[in-house]
Curated annotation (Swiss-Prot):
Protein name: Methionyl-tRNA formyltransferase
Catalysed conversion reaction: L-methionyl-tRNA(fMet) + (6R)-10-formyltetrahydrofolate = N-formyl-L-methionyl-tRNA(fMet) + (6S)-5,6,7,8-tetrahydrofolate + H(+)
Gene that this sequence comes from: fmt
Organism: Prochlorococcus marinus subsp. pastoris (strain CCMP1986 / NIES-2087 / MED4)
Membership in a protein family: Belongs to the Fmt family.
EC number: 2.1.2.9
Length: 328
């Protein structure tokens, strides 16, 4: 089938790569315009554009798409069967969605209608979901409201973070796109609606995955150890706190139970109830910090101006003091 691919970040590249290697014809790629790097004003292409250019696929980077008559004319002239969309970065208007013969299809990284919106992977980890997945839906004007053609679930492991789960869902999206396109192709002469499921058919709670903002990245030590652990994984590697007025990105922690502290004979301050307090500095183990519930052990972090460091290195860099607070 003749396909126009819409995508921008690294997350989208695997699907483009798999489709390029298939029997389908990728007639063009639409991606976000080059962005200026924060330093040096050098323009940086999107990962999707880099891959498409390497593979000699025509690339379009429109600044605007809504009411862009010239661009819409180009899309019509390309006469494609499908638009395949994954993390393009802008909402497509109906005038564009309806151009392909067999409509426009999107891979969404959640089990719809749970986590419609911009940050489904982050929110699935933040909320402690045990499963997630990918659904291929026919696009419509509403935000992630389309009917679902194919879907597959995967388990969210306890140690999954944004990086690992994103990789799993990117791979899964590429797999499901092939299956969905095959279903569409095999049913070209039938009513595709017979294969689609309404999102309400799944009997799931509707939730919205709003965009992550700067405040979301700040660790609140008055939260439970479990909530802090989820935040660090969900917003990897950018969840942060401050110590001695310096920013510290927390990369990896371990929740310590009372049993484990007693079993390993860790020497810590006892009868301490203030969250965010350093209660233990243990050589070859690390810094132990209080939360609303269990204490946590700091395994990896990045102090501003430094590289990611582990336990003993962090003790040397931070020069921490038992009884002092993070975020003070």
């Amino acid at each position: 089938m003749r396909i126009i691919f819409w995508g921008t970040p690294e997350y989208s590249v695997k699907s483009l790569e798999v489709l390029k290697k298939s029997d389908h014809d990728i007639v063009a790629v639409i991606t976000q315009p080059d962005k200026k790097r924060s330093r040096g004003n050098k323009l940086i292409s999107s990962p999707v554009k880099e891959y498409a250019t390497k593979e000699n696929i025509p690339v379009f980077t429109p600044e605007t798409i809504k009411e862009n008559i010239q661009f819409i004319s180009i899309l019509n002239d390309l006469s494609c069967d499908l638009f395949i969309v994954i993390a393009y970065g802008k909402i497509l208007p109906k005038a564009i969605l309806d151009i392909p013969k067999y409509k426009s299809w999107n891979a969404h990284a959640s089990l719809l209608p749970r986590w419609r919106g911009a940050a489904p992977i982050q929110w699935s980890i933040l909320e402690g979901d045990k499963i997630t997945g990918v659904g291929i839906m026919r696009m419509e004007e509403g935000l992630d409201t389309g009917d679902v053609l194919v879907e597959k679930q995967i388990k969210i492991e306890n140690n999954d973070n944004l990086k690992t789960l994103t990789k799993k869902l990117s791979d899964l999206s590429s797999e499901l796109f092939l299956r969905a396109i095959s279903d569409i192709e095999q049913n070209k002469n039938r009513d595709i609606n017979l294969l689609l499921k309404k999102q309400t058919d799944f009997k799931r709670e509707l939730k919205y995955a709003r965009m992550i903002n700067k405040l979301d990245y700040i660790i609140n030590w008055e939260n439970s150890a479990t909530d802090i652990y989820r935040k660090i994984n969900a917003l990897y590697p950018r969840a942060n706190t401050t110590y001695k007025r310096k920013n510290l990105k927390i990369i990896k922690i371990k929740i310590l139970t009372t049993h484990e502290i007693h079993n390993k004979n860790y020497k810590i301050l006892s009868n301490v109830f203030k969250p965010g307090l350093i209660i233990g500095l243990i050589k070859n183990v690390g810094i132990i910090i209080t939360t609303k519930t269990d204490p946590i052990l700091l395994l990896e972090a990045k102090l501003e101006g430094k590289k990611v460091s582990s336990q003993n290195q962090l003790i040397q860099q931070l020069n921490p003091v038992i009884g002092e607070n993070f975020s003070d």
